[in-house]
Amino acid sequence: MQFLHKRMHLNAGDTVVVHCSHQSNIILTTDSNFNNYRNGRQFQHHGGGGFFQKLPAHLRAPYSGYWNVTIDLGGGSGNVTHSISVIPA
């Protein structure tokens, strides 16, 4: 499984903006759900994540805490450029 990952603290209502050079699955998860994702187990994501053909993706943190932003390349490889920023609530 190939993915890009960033862990960050977000406040409730913050919007994560993800730019990526390739269409991809982009998800926002808690630490426990990220561990499940990474280990191939069932997981839940939050904030409107999923498969994005049109970017940037906007994901909203439902509550304050540490969150994991994951860009899943879907088995693809190659050079991927991306950026992750936050718009405060």
Cite the ranges covered by each PLM segment.
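Acidic, Ser/Thr/Pro
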Residues: 1-89
